[in-house]
């Protein structure tokens, strides 16, 4: 499989774009080599500039739950664009989106549209601080909530130390308000609240962690967070940018039957276009301007073309049996790869929730936290990744990113993927 045109484009891109990409993970630093440049998508397939075809399990990092260029989504976008690309004023379409989200997401009484997941989480944090009058937030190691200053923070040297920045350019005074503990460790959360509880505005958590690959909550974890927030008057924020409409129609909160105070959304809700949203309890959301004193605004918020793409997608995923089929296809894929890894005598485990999955090259039976994920055999993943790419299978170019199945993936696509995996894993074991 040649990538001459991709390589040429990457060299050209580096002359005018930092690192040649507009988001770091696209640069292939996690797997080595140079990125693939794509030109079009159709259903479960992507086509690169060298006319290679791939079965796609990235799906634009999650949004394309109905596959590439679904005719109903494309038609909705074309119709909306013909009426105008944006007005910077209210439209009926954004009302329909708000009504749909409040009907489908258990926690949402009111919702505000934004243009990205980072905007959504940043705004939800500000709102939680404004509502509680507190400054500190608690997040979990390995969970990614966008690139806002208060969220690019890691734990200090001990469980009770204040946070430190993970990027230059973030003031220590900002990072110190962010406390970080291990995902799925309720004991650490309780210890932090024992010391700082009256100062903590919010816990922000992914119901299923998707940036340490795919790590679901252990039984009782989300329920425990709900109880702790209730006990201390803190706001529970579910970051469902990734899990929203991906693991279930009502997101992770419906799947696990735990209702947060605020929810952030993105990805699927935009149908492939740049959209984010945050919403929740009426009492909290009424703190947002123009009703309340907590300021938030956006020139492109509620863009009519993006709303049309999102609404068309949300209509499709409400079809009877949609999520049952998505989960079955994902399970076929994951179980098939695990079986072929066993046949090749290569240690591997996997996690799957709905149409979201993660593969881990490890002898451990279960991956439940970031430390375990980082201790997996990363070099083996790199070899597996490039082997699958050569066979026309496109996974995320990082061992710490979840994979996604769409409704466009049929049995033929799964079978072709498993055939490629069998060959690649056999070669890795030789």
UniProtKB/Swiss-Prot annotation:
It catalyses: (S)-4-amino-5-oxopentanoate = 5-aminolevulinate. Belongs to the class-III pyridoxal-phosphate-dependent aminotransferase family. HemL subfamily. GO terms for molecular function: glutamate-1-semialdehyde 2,1-aminomutase activity; pyridoxal phosphate binding; transaminase activity. Keywords: Cytoplasm, Isomerase, Porphyrin biosynthesis, Pyridoxal phosphate. Homodimer. GO terms for cellular component: cytoplasm. Its cofactor is pyridoxal 5'-phosphate. It is found in: Cytoplasm. One of its GO terms (biological process) is protoporphyrinogen IX biosynthetic process. Its main location: cytoplasm. HAMAP family: HemL_aminotrans_3. This is Glutamate-1-semialdehyde 2,1-aminomutase. The keyword DNA damage does not apply. InterPro entries: 4pyrrol_synth_GluAld_NH2Trfase (IPR004639), Aminotrans_3 (IPR005814), Aminotrans_3_PPA_site (IPR049704), PyrdxlP-dep_Trfase (IPR015424), PyrdxlP-dep_Trfase_major (IPR015421), PyrdxlP-dep_Trfase_small (IPR015422). Transmembrane segments: none annotated. PANTHER family: GLUTAMATE-1-SEMIALDEHYDE 2,1-AMINOMUTASE, GLUTAMATE-1-SEMIALDEHYDE 2,1-AMINOMUTASE 1, CHLOROPLASTIC-RELATED. Pfam families: Aminotran_3. Its EC number is 5.4.3.8. Pathway: Porphyrin-containing compound metabolism; protoporphyrin-IX biosynthesis; 5-aminolevulinate from L-glutamyl-tRNA(Glu): step 2/2. It is an enzyme of class 5 (isomerase). NCBIfam families: hemL, PRK00062.1. It comes from the Bacteria. The modification N6-(pyridoxal phosphate)lysine is found at residue 267.
